[in-house]
């Protein structure tokens, strides 16, 4: 939502479903740190998502080839729910390694350097949750860009924590019926709501009904 709260406003009532590429990357992630058997992973993937496009088996092979170029820590826990009652947020950690480091899985390619803003926000939200649950400071977490076989550590910065809090305020405002203003760096050129947005930005929900 932090990239463009207006888009979040329009999408807030739409059903959320994972992409086919994510289904592949997610299933592969359970095997990181162990030999990656394409056939085993594919059979698991279609068992979870029976309607998956068969051509994505080629995508799985590309992901495996990329991941085989690096070293990965095997997970001792997967799909761990985390909660912050203070902030009213709930999240999911995809993988936790034996040394306590946590990771989230992405089906996107990696940036040349660093991590995407949305990924930094998610890591920061998880850090808030873990700190409340454990009472210990959380330095950061890893983002695993499966298609490129890249794992990037993001150390949570004060600006990330401020962004989380600001985003939660925007979320609350939208739930109260306010139409948010789009930010200066909003990705309007590739947004499917561009025309709708330009005609209604700045109005309240009550004015649109």
Where do the language-model regions lie?
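Short beta-strand-loop-alpha-helix junction that forms the active-site gateway
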Residues: 105-115
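Short amphipathic alpha-helical face segments that pack within enzyme cores
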Residues: 121-129
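Active-site catalytic microenvironments for nucleophilic, acid-base chemistry
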Residues: 15, 128-133
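Metal-dependent nuclease catalytic regions and adjoining charged, substrate-binding loops involved
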Residues: 75-88, 113, 132-209
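Hydrophobic residues embedded in beta-strands of well-ordered beta-sheets
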Residues: 101-103, 150-151
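Short, conserved loop/turn and helix-capping segments at secondary-structure boundaries
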Residues: 116-121, 158
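Metal-dependent nuclease catalytic cores that hydrolyze phosphodiester bonds in DNA/RNA
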Residues: 1-101, 209
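Glycine- and acidic-rich phosphate- and metal-coordinating loops
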Residues: 102-106, 142-144
């Amino acid at each position: 939502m932090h990239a463009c709260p207006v888009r979040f406003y329009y999408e807030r009532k739409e059903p959320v479903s994972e992409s086919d590429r994510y289904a592949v990357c997610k299933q592969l992630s359970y095997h990181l740190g162990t030999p990656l058997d394409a056939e085993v992973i594919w059979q698991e993937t279609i068992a979870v998502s029976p309607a998956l496009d068969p051509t994505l088996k080629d995508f799985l092979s590309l992901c495996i080839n990329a991941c085989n170029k690096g070293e990965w820590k095997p997970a001792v826990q997967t799909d761990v729910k985390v909660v912050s009652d203070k902030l009213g947020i709930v999240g999911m950690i995809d993988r936790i390694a034996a040394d306590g480091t946590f990771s989230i899985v992405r089906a996107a390619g990696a940036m040349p350097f660093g991590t995407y803003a949305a990924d930094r926000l998610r890591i920061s939200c998880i850090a808030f949750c873990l700190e409340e649950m454990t009472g210990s400071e959380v330095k950061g977490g890893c983002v695993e860009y499966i298609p490129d076989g890249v794992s990037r550590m993001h150390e949570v910065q004060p600006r990330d924590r401020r962004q989380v809090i600001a985003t939660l305020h925007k979320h609350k405002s939208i739930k109260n019926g306010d139409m948010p203003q789009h930010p200066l760096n909003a990705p309007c050129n590739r947004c499917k709501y561009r025309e709708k947005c330009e005609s209604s930005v700045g109005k309240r929900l009550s004015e649109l009904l």
